[in-house]
C-alpha cells in the first residue's frame, strides 16, 4: 500500500517536475521570444527613428534647397520684371517721341497746306477778278458792236427799202404812161382826121428822163 502511494507520489512528482520543466521551458521560450520581439521592436523603432531622422533631415535639406531655389527664382523674376519694365518704359518713351515728332510734322504740313491754300485762294481771287473784268469789258464791247451793227443795218435797210420803193414807183408810173400812150395811139389810128391831127400832136404827159408825168 505504502509502495503504491510512494509510486503514485513519485509519479506525481515526476509529472510535476516534467510539468514545471515544460513550463520552465515554455516560459524560457516565451521570454526568449519576448526578448527577440523586444529587440526586433527596438531595432524597428531605431530604424524607424533613423529613417524619421533621415527623413527629417532630408525634408529639412529639401526645404532649404526649395527656399534657396524660390529665393533665386524670386530674384530672377524681379530682375526680369525690372528689365521688362525698363524696356517698356524705353519703348513708351520712344513711342511718345515718335508720336510727338509725327504730331509736329503733321502740324507743319497742315500749316504749309493752309498757307498754300490761302495763297492759291488769293491768286485765284485775283485771277477771277481780272477774268471777270476782262469778260465784262469784252461783253460790253461786243454789246456796243452789236448795237452799232444793228443800227447800221437798220439804216442800210431803210435806205435800201426807200430806193427799192422809189424804183418800183417809177417803174409802175412808166408802165402806166406807156400803156396810156399805147391806148391813145390806138385810138388815133382808128379815128377821124381831127383825131388823126390830134394824134399827130404830142399828147403824152410823160417826159422821158424825168420818170414822172405832169399836167
Curated annotation (Swiss-Prot):
Residues 1-129, 190-215 are annotated as: Disordered. Transmembrane segments: none annotated. Keywords: Nucleus. The gene is LEA14. One of its GO terms (cellular component) is nucleus. Expressed in the shoot apex and leaves. Expressed in dry seeds. Expressed in roots and leaves. The lineage of its organism: Eukaryota, Viridiplantae, Streptophyta, Embryophyta, Tracheophyta. It comes from the Eukaryota. Residues 192-215 have a biased composition (Polar residues). PANTHER family: DAUER UP-REGULATED-RELATED (PTHR47372), LATE EMBRYOGENESIS ABUNDANT PROTEIN 14 (PTHR47372:SF2). This is Late embryogenesis abundant protein 14. Induction: Induced by chilling and mannitol. Induced by drought stress. Induced by salt stress. Induced by abscisic acid (ABA). Induced by D-allose and D-glucose. It comes from Oryza sativa subsp. japonica (Rice). Belongs to the LEA type 4 family. It is found in: Nucleus. Residues 13-24, 32-41, 54-81, 88-111 have a biased composition (Basic and acidic residues).
Amino acid at each position: 500500500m505504502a509502495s503504491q502511494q510512494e509510486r503514485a507520489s513519485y509519479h506525481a512528482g515526476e509529472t510535476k517536475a516534467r510539468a514545471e520543466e515544460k513550463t520552465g521551458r515554455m516560459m524560457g521560450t516565451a521570454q526568449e521570444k519576448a526578448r527577440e520581439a523586444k529587440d526586433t521592436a527596438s531595432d524597428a523603432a531605431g530604424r524607424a527613428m533613423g529613417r524619421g531622422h533621415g527623413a527629417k533631415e532630408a525634408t529639412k535639406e529639401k526645404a532649404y534647397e526649395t527656399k534657396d531655389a524660390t529665393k533665386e527664382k524670386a530674384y530672377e523674376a524681379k530682375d526680369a520684371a525690372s528689365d521688362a519694365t525698363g524696356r517698356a518704359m524705353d519703348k513708351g518713351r520712344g513711342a511718345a517721341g515718335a508720336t510727338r515728332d509725327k504730331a509736329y510734322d503733321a502740324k507743319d504740313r497742315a500749316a504749309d497746306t493752309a498757307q498754300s491754300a490761302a495763297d492759291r485762294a488769293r491768286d485765284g481771287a485775283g485771277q477771277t477778278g481780272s477774268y471777270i473784268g476782262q469778260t465784262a469789258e469784252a461783253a460790253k464791247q461786243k454789246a456796243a458792236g452789236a448795237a452799232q451793227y444793228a443800227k447800221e443795218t437798220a439804216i442800210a435797210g431803210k435806205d435800201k427799202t426807200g430806193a427799192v420803193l422809189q424804183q418800183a414807183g417809177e417803174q409802175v408810173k412808166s408802165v402806166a404812161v406807156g400803156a396810156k400812150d399805147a391806148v391813145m395811139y390806138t385810138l388815133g389810128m382808128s379815128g377821124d382826121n381831127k383825131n388823126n391831127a390830134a394824134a399827130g400832136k404830142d399828147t403824152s404827159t410823160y417826159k422821158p428822163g424825168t420818170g414822172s408825168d405832169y399836167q
